[in-house]
Structure formats: C-alpha cells, structure tokens
Amino acid sequence: MANELTWHDVLAEEKQQPYFLNTLQTVASERQSGVTIYPPQKDVFNAFRFTELGDVKVVILGQDPYHGPGQAHGLAFSVRPGIATPPSLLNMYKELENTIPGFTRPNHGYLESWARQGVLLLNTVLTVRAGQAHSHASLGWETFTDKVISLINQHREGVVFLLWGSHAQKKGAIIDKQRHHVLKAPHPSPLSAHRGFFGCNHFVLANQWLEQRGETPIDWMPVLPAESE
C-alpha cells in the first residue's frame, strides 16, 4: 500500500541529485571552516526521523531554523527542553489555550510528541548560520523540501496542511485540495498573529478532519519524552 512507503523509498533518488549533494557539501564546508551552523548535523533531518512518510497526518511548514544557540533541533517551531519558548510558538500555545478545552501552556517548547503522532514539522530550509536568518535560503534546500511536499501530495491522502504566512502558502500551492485538507492563516509571529492567526481554530479543525476520516486526533499538549513513558 502507498502509505507503507518510507522517506527512504521516495527520497533516495532525490538525495543523489547534484543540487542536493552540493547543498550538503556547502553546509559541510562551512562547518569545517569554523562557521556555526544550526541545527547540529545529527539533527538536520529530524523531521523525517520522527515522522515517517506513512505516518504523516498533519504538515506544519516553517521557514528556516532558529538561529540562536541551542534552539534548533530539526523540527519546525520546536526548541530543545531548557530553551526559552520562542514568540511564534508562544502564540501557537495561546491559540491552543483559547480553542482546545483543558490545554495548559507547557513550560517548554519541545514538540517531539507532536512529531511522534504524525505532525511533520518541516522547515522549508533545513540549516542556517548562527545569528543570520535566511543565510542558507538559496543553498538548494527549497528544491528538496518542494520535492518532499510533492511526494506527500502524491503518496498520501487526507493530510492536513497548516500553511501560516505567505511563504508557507506559496510553498503549498502545489497541494491537491481534492486529496488533502489545506488550512491557511497569517503566521503566528508577533508581527502577524493578530491579523488572523489568533482565532483561526486550525488545531481544532485539523482534529475534526482527522476524526471524520476515522483517524486518531492529535493530542496537542506537548509532552517531554520522560513524561510520556
């Protein structure tokens, strides 16, 4: 069945493309020359490690990784335990508090428990130089993540895409809205959240869609790994 395909099955060929090898080489060269790149090399592909292709229920698109020390670990919007929750994620928590009964804002910003339930937290650019937003925007990552989105579009059905802000919405233009459920809103950043992210109800609507399809809804309360054992 289609949803038994793995990321390896569908991306192995893409990862041999010259542009992709060049992207990896450029990032590796910068690291070797002493430039601090986030996230650490072992974490660059964590979105795919934590959420297998056949398990994807929801896709949340970010832009590029956080560029402060210790923040980025390969999942869009998420930060490691012990790192202050960034403003956009705080606004996501605020929307959850306002719409999900019983949701209480956690004291961390670690979203692995979302990823493990089938929420693909995908940045469209997978690396960044320390302190320099969008510094790797033209390295080829966008081509790769465009391919990822097209593969989800092609191989899965009934995935909820949460597209926040114009960048994510442009990126998601290829999604077949007959096969998938696309929800759009302004970005949760403090600059734009008040223009319609607050009140968009996306977390509730995503779960309603999943339940209508007979799938388990997402528990949006982020849980640290030790707490979930």
Curated annotation (Swiss-Prot):
<keyword id="KW-0963">Cytoplasm</keyword>
<protein>
    <recommendedName>
        <fullName>Uracil-DNA glycosylase</fullName>
        <ecNumber>3.2.2.27</ecNumber>
    </recommendedName>
</protein>
<dbReference type="InterPro" id="IPR036895">
    <property type="entry name" value="Uracil-DNA_glycosylase-like_sf"/>
</dbReference>
<comment type="similarity">
    <text>Belongs to the uracil-DNA glycosylase (UDG) superfamily. UNG family.</text>
</comment>
<dbReference type="InterPro" id="IPR018085">
    <property type="entry name" value="Ura-DNA_Glyclase_AS"/>
</dbReference>
<dbReference type="Pfam" id="PF03167">
    <property type="entry name" value="UDG"/>
</dbReference>
<dbReference type="InterPro" id="IPR005122">
    <property type="entry name" value="Uracil-DNA_glycosylase-like"/>
</dbReference>
<comment type="function">
    <text>Excises uracil residues from the DNA which can arise as a result of misincorporation of dUMP residues by DNA polymerase or due to deamination of cytosine.</text>
</comment>
<dbReference type="GO" id="GO:0005737">
    <property type="term" value="C:cytoplasm"/>
</dbReference>
<dbReference type="InterPro" id="IPR002043">
    <property type="entry name" value="UDG_fam1"/>
</dbReference>
<dbReference type="GO" id="GO:0097510">
    <property type="term" value="P:base-excision repair, AP site formation via deaminated base removal"/>
</dbReference>
<dbReference type="GO" id="GO:0004844">
    <property type="term" value="F:uracil DNA N-glycosylase activity"/>
</dbReference>
<keyword id="KW-0234">DNA repair</keyword>
<keyword id="KW-0227">DNA damage</keyword>
<feature type="active site" description="Proton acceptor">
    <location>
        <position position="64"/>
    </location>
</feature>
<keyword id="KW-0378">Hydrolase</keyword>
